[in-house]
Amino acid sequence: MASEDIAKLAETLAKTQVAGGQLSFKGKGLKLNTAEDAKDVIKEIEEFDGLEALRLEGNTVGVEAARVIAKALEKKSELKRCHWSDMFTGRLRSEIPPALISLGEGLITAGAQLVELDLSDNAFGPDGVRGFEALLKSPACFTLQELKLNNCGMGIGGGKILAAALTECHRKSSAQGKPLALKVFVAGRNRLENDGATALAEAFGIIGTLEEVHMPQNGINHPGVTALAQAFAINPLLRVINLNDNTFTEKGGVAMAETLKTLRQVEVINFGDCLVRSKGAVAIADAVRGGLPKLKELNLSFCEIKRDAALVVAEAVADKAELEKLDLNGNALGEEGCEQLQEVMDSFNMAKVLASLSDDEGEDEDEEEEGEEDDEEEEDEEDEEDDDEEEEEQEEEEEPPQRGSGEEPATPSRKILDPNSGEPAPVLSSPTPTDLSTFLSFPSPEKLLRLGPKVSVLIVQQTDTSDPEKVVSAFLKVASVFRDDASVKTAVLDAIDALMKKAFSCSSFNSNTFLTRLLIHMGLLKSEDKIKAIPSLHGPLMVLNHVVRQDYFPKALAPLLLAFVTKPNGALETCSFARHNLLQTLYNI
């Protein structure tokens, strides 16, 4: 390290925050590769008496630097809180496990008794979980109360490793007469899916002391949701349940509602964007009406709930004196339904509690019926472990005996919700196929899958591939529904491949303009147009990681894309796993 760099580092360290037993290097942007780089950090640690909390967020720590920092921690037995989120930026994934192993060994040697461990926003994947597995099983974590692993890309494998480690920690600590009493568990955006969630649910059921569970955006469907619901029922102290942006369907909604009936301490329920639909919402409303005396927030936004079910939910919160927010935005109430909902809440003197309804999707008489069919399809898929077998079985189950080759499947009699009883009532309905314009107006994975294999042809036919702005619009709408679910992922990438292959092969298509406009809409490049950036970059980044590896992608665009994805940006920081994967791919082009 050059002398001027050392001087700069020393100046940065001089501003290090020291308060209440806490030593903070948070957000210093330190690049600690070697032992020499970490020399001043180590000095600060060694000279700090009574160190209880160490903040390393917002720096980047290499293997060698981690080893010497760990050595310094071996004498810090009073350390209780490790705030180590976002501290491997720019590191190869292979560097992270050995760095974590070293740090964990330092804590174990010190005889520390941790209360909080935060490793969020480190894109370490399943192998990274192996890096702190031994720490979790050790006496250093027998006292752990808060475990935060948000946005780490653990996947199913990492979820299973984590669950086993927590179970072992509980077993060992129980043998010493002081069972692990974990209170807060955070693991959003980790692609846990059903198997990972189910494994963790088993661990939660054994632990039994949870007060907060945050697991949004994990691709969990109703089998995983049901497993979690069963585990939550054995955790009577639960106050916060955040499963935002997973796919409950009605089956998961009903299962979770049954658990809510048994809990008395719950204050916050966040099931937004979970597709509980009307039947699930009515079941949850029943649980709210009969209990949950401390409820402060109920989020059922963007769940495909219709008017009558939404009114049932509103009526259920009438006696919740502590309620601060009811969010039913983004459902299918219609203008009249929104007015009725506001009137109901106003009649309870709770108008201020109701969140905005500005994104209501409008009343659609056929949408509920389509949703019922989606539930059946999703359940058929989830019953099989192999993705390819899932798709084949689903096709077979949907195929009626009279179906001929090349014909559309006949629409059977379906059920819609009886608004009075909340029970399904049989009706006959005519087919309501989804067309591309419907999908592009309100994109969702279900609508994309309903288009079937023809989506690739349709998107090419109905998009002006000579116009970069129109291609960007179609690209972002398809990418927005990207999920790790095999069928959704395949449908998204097939549609994107067809669109981009046609666009890049068009002689009048300006590739540079396309990338520029894409970066603007993603909020990575400023524009005089004052275009509002899309809300989430996860889908577009995951899709771009696929696109840049295809033969049709002009490799001359890679350096420009790399430059903007590398630049610091708040929107990118919330998608560190997807960003890391794309950067790795771009570096290798």
From Swiss-Prot:
List residues, modification Phosphothreonine: T411, T438
What highest taxon heads this organism's lineage? Answer: Eukaryota
**Documented effect of changing T411D:** Greatly reduced phosphorylation by CDK1 or CDK2. Completely abolished phosphorylation by CDK1 or CDK2
Protein location:
Cytoplasm; Nucleus, Nucleoplasm; Nucleus envelope; Chromosome, Centromere, Kinetochore
Q: Please give the annotated consequence of changing E528A.
A: No UBE2I binding nor sumoylation
- State how changing K526A affects the protein, per the record: No UBE2I binding nor sumoylation
The protein's GO terms of the molecular function aspect are: GTPase activator activity; RNA binding; small GTPase binding; ubiquitin protein ligase binding
Motif SUMO conjugation, chain ranges? 525-528
Recorded consequence of changing A563L: No effect on UBE2I binding nor on sumoylation
Spans of the LRR repeats? Answer: 48-71, 111-134, 207-230, 235-258, 292-315, 320-343
GO terms for biological process? cellular response to vasopressin; negative regulation of protein export from nucleus; nuclear export; protein sumoylation; response to axon injury; signal transduction
Self-association or partners: how does it assemble? Homodimer. Interacts with RAN. Forms a complex with RANBP2/NUP358, NXF1 and NXT1. Forms a tight complex in association with RANBP2 and UBE2I/UBC9, the ubiquitin-conjugating enzyme E2. Interacts with UBE2I; the interaction conjugates SUMO1 to RANGAP1, and subsequently stabilizes interactions of sumoylated RANGAP1 with RANBP2. The complex composed of RANBP2, SUMO1, RANGAP1 and UBE2I associates with nuclear pore complexes. Identified in a complex composed of RAN, RANBP2, sumoylated RANGAP1, UBE2I and XPO1. Interacts with TRAF6. Interacts with SUMO1 and SENP1.
Name it.
Ran GTPase-activating protein 1
User: What organism, scientifically named, is this protein from?
Assistant: Mus musculus
Q: Report the gene name.
A: Rangap1
